[in-house]
Amino acid sequence: MSPCVNSSVQCATRKSLPNMMIRRFLSSAAYDATLNTLKRDLKTAMMQKKAVEKNTVKSVIAAIKGAEIDGSKQDEFALFKTLSKMHKQRVQSASEYASQNRDDLAQVEQAEAGIIERYLQSLPVASSAQVQDKLRQFCSQVQSQEGEVPMKKVFGMVGEVVGEWNTSMELVRPLVPGVYKEVWGDKKK
């Protein structure tokens, strides 16, 4: 009799454990370094009894682990996406609290946003402004060489060079339509 017959929980755990371990080895060096930094900072915040920093770092680690379980890539671009989302949420919450005259809560959210921003800046990923500048230069170059190009083709061309820009296609994709309209005008192709 197999040890998994009596407990479906054990079976699920045993089956998924090797996949999780394999995925863990596929993470990038920047991903691992950031995770180690977060764990070290959590320990420091706990020893120094910094409640806001401790809670923020715990929530960041939980979000990263949640993304790992969901099967997302384990690289600096996935971290950037997760941290950007968390930062945006904190900034929005702070402005909502401030508009409702809850300055105490707004200050906590702003402090959390600052902590998350510190980790965002430590990642070796190009900022949105840098990516937009590179995209604008790239589209201008394509326009001068090839003239009118459909947006679909621009997406394909950008996909080939996106790795050189130190970003991911996921981060570039929403910027392409705006830059396309700047360079080629408001033509839909």
UniProtKB/Swiss-Prot annotation:
It is found in: Mitochondrion. GO terms for molecular function: carbon-nitrogen ligase activity, with glutamine as amido-N-donor. InterPro entries: Asn/Gln_tRNA_amidoTrase-B-like (IPR003789), YqeY/Aim41 (IPR019004), YqeY/Aim41_N (IPR042184). Residues 1-32 form a transit peptide. The keyword Transit peptide applies. One of its GO terms (cellular component) is mitochondrion. SUPFAM superfamilies: GatB/YqeY motif. Keywords: Mitochondrion, Transit peptide. Pfam families: YqeY. Gene3D superfamilies: Uncharacterised protein YqeY/AIM41 PF09424, N-terminal domain (1.10.1510.10). Belongs to the AIM41 family. This is Altered inheritance of mitochondria protein 41, mitochondrial. It comes from Meyerozyma guilliermondii (strain ATCC 6260 / CBS 566 / DSM 6381 / JCM 1539 / NBRC 10279 / NRRL Y-324) (Yeast). The gene is AIM41.
